[in-house]
């Protein structure tokens, strides 16, 4: 019979780092509230969580890489909002941020959740930060709780 590995939604004893961009902070703060809510509901306590605020989304991957390399975290959550404007800036930032966050996870082996909203409008961002479409910060935290437990099981 094969061995099955499944992550549990139990944050007890795990160490979490959260990187949140301050640009569009009215969205980032709602995402952070959602992530903290998920972690605390699933057994984490404040001592297990470090929140690092950075200027904007572009600074998130480098900060996450530094945190992942420290050995102090079982999982990371990256939060922020990039909202389309009238210039191509959105395309460059959203592309590099998503690639950068994926690279951190692959290069370090530390689970990293992508909770950076990339939306066409402010309304879409608001919907995904705790109104109609749920809270993507909460969802990102649930993802890393589960995958951190999968990794723990695989040791």
From Swiss-Prot:
SUPFAM superfamilies: Lumazine synthase (SSF52121)
Pathway(s) the chain acts in: Cofactor biosynthesis; riboflavin biosynthesis; riboflavin from 2-hydroxy-3-oxobutyl phosphate and 5-amino-6-(D-ribitylamino)uracil: step 1/2
Residues given in the record as 5-amino-6-(D-ribitylamino)uracil binding sites: 23, 57-59, 81-83, 114
Top-rank lineage group of the source organism: Bacteria
EC top class, as a word: transferase
Active site residues per record: 89
GO cellular component: cytosol; riboflavin synthase complex
EC number(s) from the headed UniProt entry: 2.5.1.78
Swiss-Prot/TrEMBL catalytic activity: (2S)-2-hydroxy-3-oxobutyl phosphate + 5-amino-6-(D-ribitylamino)uracil = 6,7-dimethyl-8-(1-D-ribityl)lumazine + phosphate + 2 H2O + H(+)
UniProt-annotated binding residues for (2S)-2-hydroxy-3-oxobutyl phosphate: 86-87, 128
Pfam families: DMRL_synthase
GO process terms (BP): riboflavin biosynthetic process
Gene3D superfamilies, alphabetized: Lumazine/riboflavin synthase (3.40.50.960)
An example Gene Ontology molecular-function term: 6,7-dimethyl-8-ribityllumazine synthase activity
Entry keywords, A to Z: Riboflavin biosynthesis, Transferase
Role noted for this protein: Catalyzes the formation of 6,7-dimethyl-8-ribityllumazine by condensation of 5-amino-6-(D-ribitylamino)uracil with 3,4-dihydroxy-2-butanone 4-phosphate. This is the penultimate step in the biosynthesis of riboflavin.
Family: Belongs to the DMRL synthase family.
Official protein name in the record: 6,7-dimethyl-8-ribityllumazine synthase
Lineage start: Bacteria, Pseudomonadati, Thermodesulfobacteriota, Desulfuromonadia, Geobacterales
Gene name as annotated: ribH
């Amino acid at each position: 019979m094969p061995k099955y590995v499944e992550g549990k939604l139990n944050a007890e004893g795990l160490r979490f780092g959260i990187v949140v961009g301050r640009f569009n902070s009215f969205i980032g703060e709602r995402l952070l509230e959602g992530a903290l809510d998920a972690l605390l509901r699933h057994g984490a306590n404040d001592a297990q969580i470090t929140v690092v605020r950075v200027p904007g989304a572009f600074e998130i991957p480098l900060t996450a890489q530094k945190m992942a390399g420290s050995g102090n975290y079982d999982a990371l959550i990256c939060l922020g909002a990039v909202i389309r404007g009238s210039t191509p800036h959105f395309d460059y930032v959203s592309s590099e941020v998503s690639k950068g966050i994926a690279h951190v996870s692959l290069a370090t082996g530390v689970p990293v959740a992508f909770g950076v909203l990339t939306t066409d409008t402010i309304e879409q961002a608001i919907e995904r930060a705790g109104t109609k479409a749920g809270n993507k910060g909460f969802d990102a935290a649930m993802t890393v709780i589960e995958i951190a437990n999968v990794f723990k099981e695989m040791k």
